[in-house]
Amino acid sequence: MVMRMVFVENKINGVENIRQEIDNLNVSNYKEIYDKFKNVFSKNRDIFNYYVDKLIELMKNLDDNELSLEIDKFMLCILKDSIIWEFKAGGSVWDLSIKDIKDNIIILGCSNHLFALDIKTGNKIWEYKVEHNVDSLFIKDNIVMLEYRGGHVCVLDVMTGDKIWESKVGERMWGFSLKDNIVILGDGDKYIYAIDVRTGGKLWEFEAEWCVWELSIKDDKIILRCEDEYGCEYFYVLDIKTGEKILEFGGEWHVSDLLISGDVTILADMWGCVYALDTNLYSKIQRVRPQLTNIMKEIVKIDLTLLKKSLNLNEWDELPIQITNKSLKDITISKISIINEEDILFKDIEPIKIRGRDTKVINLFINPKVKGKLPIDIVVEFEDEFNIRYKERFTEVLTITKFKGDNVDDMRPEKIDKILKQEIDNLNTSNYKEIYSRFKNIFNENRAVFNYYMNKLIELVNNSNDELAINVGKFILDILGIKRVDELLWEFRAEGGVRLLSIKGDIVILGCVSGHVYAIDIKTGKKLWEFKAEDTVWGLSIKDDIVVLGCGNIFESIVMLKNGKILEEGYAYALDINTGREIWRSKIKHDVRSLSIKDDIVVLGCKKGYILALDINAGNMLWEFKAKSGKSIRNLSIKNDILLFGCDNYLYALDIDTGRELWRFKAEGEVKSLSIKKDNVLLGCRGGYVYLLDINTGEKMERFKVVGSVLRLSIKDDIVILGCNRECVYALDINAGENLWAFKTDGDVNGLSIKNDAVLLGCDNYLYALDINTGEEIWKFKTESAVLDLSIKDNIVISGCKRGHVYALDFNIIKNYSIIQKIKQVL
């Protein structure tokens, strides 16, 4: 016993002696000390850690960078020498999970294998192989749960590796969250699933409106954080046991974060406000609206009466339909379809509002190609004040008498147009209103004939005396108030939100969130070809007959995994504009966020502040530049040989041939948009800051301030149009520094273009045309979903929306509105 005590005492004294030597460590003896006590370090981790701490302290106190680097390399070497054990998995290890320390088991995922190792020795306890790469895993009690490609979930015994159950949940899954015996999984898109961890049975599933990129569990509630195409965040709160939606926040709330504590929900918005809500009470309030709309759906009914059951087509005839709103609520008729086996008429009308318990007569011009008694179905589509849509069908019999002596070909559209134009050619000051009344429904259907009529009216204004011109001018204004400019030339439905569009000749190129790329005939809306990229299309530009795409991960902040590796790369593609044939593709080491072209140079703005330049002919990289900030680059513009881009609070100017930095300018807010006018750069920033800079030097010439972040901007002469995120559009005179006008929209401005003296806006679910000089609304068009981008070619306005809708509108109807504005001024 005495001998053992002496041994322990000597051991303690030995350690203290070593510590004393280490305390004298310096730049000349640190290697010598390591060699002297290497064997002691391998057995005593405490004393080894003490040595490493002293090395780090020494390195921090050195002014010599080369010597510090030498010590740093030395530390890496000795740390490698101190490895306790090593295991070769045969591939990239992307996930580790440790069972309770007492069980001494570590689980690791590698490609399509799962290994269980002894944490002390590194010896393999068991191995399990699945069909595809394992994406995630976790351990609960005595089971290990893993998810592998294809949406498969598997549960194993953690001690033996034996399979307990396996189930296919969705198409693809990501991550796990666990509460009691309920596992919550996401599919990487909009679906969330709840699984019983004991049996593998699906308890429920929930579909969010937007892509879910983060979920957390608090007590018995699940919080989902979603993000739309603009990066705006939405939150759902679900009941973990049933999947029932308790709360939803987004849109008008502009929520930036959400927490739940007991019965209180805490919201923070992007304007710096924090709200505390009673969770249960607010949940009840949010449920009231669906209940009300269900009640409305039950009671909104209409009656339809055919007022004329026989049509004689010796003259242009109309079919009068009487519709009665039987409910107490107002409704809006949006479409009437009259169909039989011959599909005799498919008719769109301008919206007609019918108040509760009211009746209206609607006259429809009808042009059948058959005669006799026809059984027809009349389908009326309408919506109530809650925007709930309805469709009702009525069956009638209609008798048709044809033109005497005419054959079916006499009713060809081209003959109808010819007859109508002959009538319009006889337009004069006494019959112009009568002609409009007779052919109003035809005008609603036939844009070419309506434009022909409008041009004749304009000629009448120009050739009349002032008093008569004013009368005709008033009539024109009335027509434009009645006539919907939102009747479409065509509509196309893409797969995924249409983020970008570009026009070359008669071809419209669409780039989608889903990675789909379409070429559309601008005149007909017919699809010419389709291409599928690897990821979301963030950049799109056309040079000659080459379409160049920049693609990357749809998420801004989520790390994507592939085969256990962090997926950060993007892609650039070059396609033949006429065929869609892939000319080349280039794998980029960073996710692409923007794209522009100058001559044969393709410039890509990427995540983490990188700018890359590629050769347009082969896709080879020419140069690379790294901005000071690591944020994504979403704004690129090129003038002559100067490349301009915004990254965080800085605007950079580079030589486009070499990538050399020419100058940089620091703004007071994050750069959101930019535009070039002659030798000046206009900059729109977060916080409403607007700057005018000299393009050659970066010198600040003017500074303006508006409300809200400037998301879009465009310049016409000396007028700058600013589209902001607080549902406002501003016009500035850059010479006078004055605010000319402001216009309130129904959402953030995502598309902005100028055509002659009209400003075109894409905001939320609307397209607007505004007078650039006054800000007065010329027309407004409602879309099925939020407008993401717009462009105009000749007189055709193309808009792409978040749910894949693409609309083509004829701008020709208001090409003469400047004359109309003059009439208004006279009035």
Curated annotation (Swiss-Prot):
Transmembrane segments: none annotated. InterPro entries: PQQ_b-propeller_rpt, PQQ_rpt_dom, Quinoprotein_ADH-like_sf, WD40/YVTN_repeat-like_dom_sf. Keywords: Plasmid. Pfam families: PQQ_2. The lineage of its organism: Archaea, Methanobacteriati, Methanobacteriota, Methanomada group, Methanococci. This is Uncharacterized protein MJECL23.
